[in-house]
Amino acid sequence: KYFFNKLSEVEGPEGITAGGGYWSARISYLLGNAKEANYFLKKAATKERTFYGSLAMASLGYKYKPNFDLPKYDNNLINKILKHMGGVRALALIEVNEFYKAAREFRKIIPKFDLKDYPQLLSFTSKNNMPGLTFRLAAILRNDHNKILLGGLYPVPSWKIETSDLKDKALLYAIARQESGFNPRARSSSKAMGVLQIIPSTAAFIMKNRE
């Protein structure tokens, strides 16, 4: 219990401190100290965007309503994009649904934008089916500037998915976010490929085609 208590107090990743608080609460409850358990649950619940923070909030009966709204982008942003040849190419590629190639063009010109433009850029890339770039921009704002835009950190791609047998799109998006950051060209040293980082031999086994 001592180590979980200390873990809840350290300055570090929110997921770690929330886990320390949650397990301190569990142990305190089992030891019959409800007041202390409540204290640590409340402490963990302040990290509502983490797994253990969510568990703590549920244990306390709190309701969490995340805001996934992104700011609207305006014509000023479009004009800034058009000032760069890469931006012109990106807009042209969007017109013909070449979103991955458009995102590659955008990555080259992102450093030319001011930080204050990033929220609108997030909105633009999200609306135009560039989840990987949206996620990366949102991560920069979170990691370097402590600005949280949940709509950017958890983008919803406009993928054409056959939904007849798919029960949970959110799970598919979560795997894509974790495994590849929505990068369709991602490859690992173990030969895993694509947004879901599927290993060809595994795919062949599942499809019963090992030729």
What are the language-model segments listed below?
Residues 1-5, 60-66, 94-100, 148:
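Helix-turn-helix repeat elements of alpha-solenoid scaffolds
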Residues 1-4, 13-16, 24-27, 31-43, ...:
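Catalytic glycan-binding domains that act on GlcNAc-containing polysaccharides
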Residues 71-84:
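TPR-adjacent "capping" and linker segments in tetratricopeptide-repeat scaffold/adaptor proteins
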Residues 49-53, 58-67:
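Long, contiguous interaction/recruitment modules in multidomain scaffold/adaptor proteins
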Residues 12, 48, 77-78:
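Structural signature of alpha-solenoid helical repeat scaffolds
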Residues 85-101, 105-108:
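Alpha-helical segment of the N-proximal tetratricopeptide repeat
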